[in-house]
């Protein structure tokens, strides 16, 4: 894929750089191109760290890179600070009692209220946990303290890394932001930041989009804006651009407005009305806020003649220990026909306890897991054997969730959503996906706060050629309409200038 002029500018800009990348602008392609170029041009012993929010995103970066990344760190935010700061240097700050094996457990049962309780949990149980208050971040608070107090830690990071790349920065919380800026401003490690405050859908769990905005004005950063949406048609671009001050200037009227339909309808008629404007031969998605509304919506659309597949959240999606990736990989191995032992091996995190295991042994153990799916106890034993071999610990409640995921076929669709022409999913699960046609409900977005506005922006920018907004007569839906009119009015635009009301 060729680079656009602004993408080339970003790839060729040296030093600290922040990129504001609107939806559909080719952010990942640009970042991967930049990482590859700067690794190839590096003439020192130093390496890079590419830091993401999910193992899936890290794997996508690894898969796309055409250069050897064996020595480089490509992984999640938490794994970076745990493996590079906490595990090797905690003993420098807290003493030899903390020179021990550590594992993570962010489950509800392991949560604590205070920093001192979390420190004690490491000492007594070897567990890195999280706070009861999900807007506070113990892991990054601890890493920050260690980094500030351990000279060896600071020297190690400075000697090892020549650049750090941070993806989806709008989802960073305040503790993450403080640590990353310490790496940049104090340790002088060059930093590349990419994000978009318009897509911050995790404010409820502590995401702090203002942190991203604050870097935009820093004198030691060059800033670039990617606004060309290669996914959505011009009319949908207009609609999404009018939602935010910084993109309103990108609005330009279009002669045809049929790509966005506003349906004023009822709870009994919405499905049949919406399907009048859906092409059954093109992929589409119903995006709702709650799982219940998503499931019910799929049923109503299906009852009206177009089969919509509800994509549920799987039981294993709730698991937050370091073994979570393995449960997911085992499920994919058992559910997806073309997913092999080699695919599982490729997913072993770079920060894992051991990545150089014998392929034949892993294949044999996976076969044992597969052959035990009809016996829950044997399934637990076979899965635990594989986890132990790879250096990971299991919990019975998590093994139960995995067994439920692989034996209850209603969850299988969640592992191969691309197989289905028409799907119904929550918009939180739709981040990073795209569909020709999208149906959203006005009542899911009051547009009265930052979180609601971000959620709506993410949902509508999943659509490529058709957006259907279902407006029923409810308080939330009426708030949506009033607030949308106010947002559009800032550009002197009315709703009817942007879409067709039915």
Regions picked out by a protein language model, each given a short descriptive name:
Residues 1-502:
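The feature marks helicase ATPase cores and/or their adjacent C-terminal helical subdomains
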